UniProtKB/Swiss-Prot annotation:
Residues 1-22, 485-508 are annotated as: Disordered. Coiled coil: none annotated. Residues 486-497 have a biased composition (Low complexity). The gene is FAM227B. It comes from Homo sapiens (Human). This is Protein FAM227B. Pfam families: FWWh. Belongs to the FAM227 family. It comes from the Eukaryota.
Length: 508
């Protein structure tokens, strides 16, 4: 009120003709109204009541309370599914209880006689309902060398059996297990490898290669090749499109391994014939048939078939190459060394009484890491490759059946393919160089220690040896300079002689 009175007085003094300016900011307005002390703290009479109400409002407006309210009151579309799920759980528990009552061992058979009968029936089924594996014993009266085997002749409607009753399926399984495929991949590849077309490919390819290397017979080889082509096309068409690339990247290599394993298993006495050259020729032939390209040289190095020299494809041990007398002598020596021992000597020096590890076992225990030659690498060249060409086996099949459109096929584009022209010559590997450097370093250290000990005892003698060594180096350097000078003088005189030779050649 006092503020209003003062304002009225000021306005009356100023006169009617002069107006006061309005406030330009909130501060001026508050000061003009005499409210510059606002806002003041507001005190409610019932503070506890207000705080309780505020807390309740916060709780009611929280996410949990809103979600709970909606869950309890809003009707849901998937409520029928929840009811169905709860009923299924209930019924599954009832079914489990019911089955546990049915298959109780005591209610099914008695403890003694019925159980023994069941065991006998199980053994009988295992014995007669499992597919038999033909184990080749040493007492079999079949020939174990190439000389005692012959091709019985091509039959159009029947595959020629492999020698010594070998089973193609077991050979394929042996090769697949050696690759250590993943379990899921192994099951997929197994169905394709053991298909009828793949089995026929192994039979006919083995006999074709047998005739080609040891019993040349053009007529039978041609008949076998015709069926090989048909079997390969059948196998190619049976593989799903999504698996074709992956399968036919490994199939030629696996087929070559299977043929090699068949030769090794069928003719153990002729294993010396199946050397690295034999593997190289066999693999090149199979790869060229399937894809038209040769594999990398030495592709067979990754084959895990070294154990074929000691074990069969079924895992049974082969007879050792030693004679009976040698084996008896070795066994007697081993028994005598193992029986005659002194426990006190063994405890004092246990290393002297440990059995030595054979070279073969030590070689297998260590992982062989490849070391490259320290010389230059392989030489490469560029060859033309038909990018749209067919596999030779498939192309032969198309020509053999004279399918329409083969001769009218458009010309395919060719690309340049990098190929190894020549492998590097055998030379010391980097591992050999490192070993030799370590040996030389050890020798240098030994010589240095000897020289150091000699210098402390006989310094004058060491000084004389050092002077002799320097004199030897100077003389060798002088001889080398003289040789270089003589070579340079002879090279400077050589152009004239070559010119004369060229002139005589032109006159002639």
């Amino acid at each position: 009120m006092a503020g209003q009175r003062t304002c009225q007085r000021r306005s009356s003094r100023a006169g009617p003709g002069k107006m006061q300016e309005p406030p330009k900011s909130i501060e001026e307005f508050l000061k003009f109204q005499n409210w510059d002390y606002w806002p003041r703290e507001i005190h409610f009479r019932d503070d506890d009541k207000w705080s309780c109400t505020l807390k309740k409002i916060k709780e009611d407006s929280s996410f949990v309370s809103i979600y709970t309210h909606l869950w309890e009151n809003v009707p849901r579309i998937f409520e029928a599914l929840l009811i169905m799920e709860s009923k299924l759980k209930e019924y599954s528990l009832i079914l489990q209880n019911h089955t546990s009552e049915i298959f109780k061992w005591k209610s099914m058979i008695s403890e003694t006689s019925s159980y023994r009968k069941l065991e006998r029936y199980g053994e009988f089924l295992k014995k007669y309902h499992k597919k038999k594996k033909i184990m080749l014993s040493d007492e079999m009266e079949t020939e174990k060398n190439i000389e005692g085997c012959s091709f019985t002749g091509f039959k159009a409607n029947e595959l020629t059996q492999l020698p010594r009753h070998l089973d193609a399926e077991q050979i394929y399984l042996f090769i697949l297990k050696a690759h250590n495929f993943d379990e899921r991949v192994f099951k997929i590849w197994k169905t394709h490898f053991l298909s009828e077309a793949s089995i026929a490919l192994l039979h006919d390819s083995f006999w074709w290669w047998f005739l080609h290397k040891f019993r040349p017979d053009r007529e039978n080889q041609d008949c076998l090749f015709d069926r090989i082509s048909e079997s390969y096309v059948t196998l190619f068409m049976s593989i799903p499109l999504s698996r074709k690339d992956a399968f036919f990247q490994i199939y030629p290599d696996c087929l070559a391994q299977a043929i090699y394993a068949t030769f090794h298993e069928a003719f153990p006495e002729s294993s010396y014939l199946f050397n690295d050259e034999f593997k190289e020729d066999l693999g090149n032939n199979i790869f060229l048939w399937c894809s038209g390209l040769k594999p990398q040289k030495g592709f067979w190095i990754h084959w895990k078939l070294k154990e074929l020299s000691t074990t069969t494809i079924h895992g049974s041990k082969k007879a050792p190459a030693k004679s009976v007398k040698e084996r008896i002598a070795d066994s007697q020596e081993h028994i005598s060394t193992s029986i005659d021992f002194n426990i006190i000597k063994i405890l004092n020096n246990p290393r002297a009484y440990t059995l030595p590890i054979s070279k073969e076992e030590s070689r297998l225990s260590r992982l062989a890491t490849k070391s490259h030659y320290s010389s230059t690498g392989p030489e490469f060249n560029r060859v033309l490759f038909n990018f749209g060409g067919q596999s030779p086996l498939i192309l032969y099949y198309l020509k053999m059946h004279e399918l329409a459109g083969i001769s009218k096929a458009p010309k395919k584009t060719k690309i340049k393919l990098t190929k190894i022209f020549q492998e590097p010559l055998p030379a010391p590997t980097y591992r050999d160089v490192i070993k030799e450097a370590k040996r030389q370093f050890a020798r240098n250290q030994k010589d240095f220690r000897i020289l150091q000990a000699k210098a402390t005892k006989k310094p004058h003698e060491v000084k004389q040896d050092f002077e002799k060594f320097l004199h030897k180096l100077r003389s060798e350097a002088e001889i080398e300079r003289e040789c270089v000078a003589s070579l340079s003088s002879s090279s400077s005189s050589s152009p004239s002689s070559t010119d004369n030779y060229n002139f005589e050649e032109e006159e002639y």
